[in-house]
Amino acid sequence: SPCFRKEVGAHGIEERGVYRIHQFEKQEMVVVCKPEDSKAWYEKLWQNTVDFFRSLDIPVRTLECCSGDLADLKVKSCDVEAWSPRQKKYFEVGSCSNLGDAQARRLGIRIRSKENPKELYFAHTLNNTVVAPPRMLIAFLENNLREDGSVAIPKPLQPYMGGMTELRKK
């Protein structure tokens, strides 16, 4: 989905370049489910992001947001952060949120009970930013860069790179 950031250029030197750009794309996962399934879906969505980055040999950690820091509507949220060897710190590369039934109430999204077809209840909604390519590119290059300037290609990407195992300047 296309995204636009208002505060471009409002931060320090560490956030120049592709880290904080005005317009970018990101790949989202959205789930609309029964209330009793939302906790399991939250775990699946979060795990998808963590597994994706780890498959690219990018170290990640997860920060659970405390209730006082949750944005409107969110019941639970966490940020996935990747390690930056250059900055020697983690930076945000994704987030996962469970909005409970709050968004469904605003949008009127209801589920009909199988047991009692006359009974309607509000769905739960969740979303997960799997990857924002500009930040993923930073994490990928920094964590796969070798001393000689070549970039290692992780095994899951090699079939899509014609079997290449590294990128090297000619």
Model-predicted segments: where are they?
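TRNA-recognition modules of translation machinery and tRNA-sensing kinases, especially anticodon-binding
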Residues: 1-170
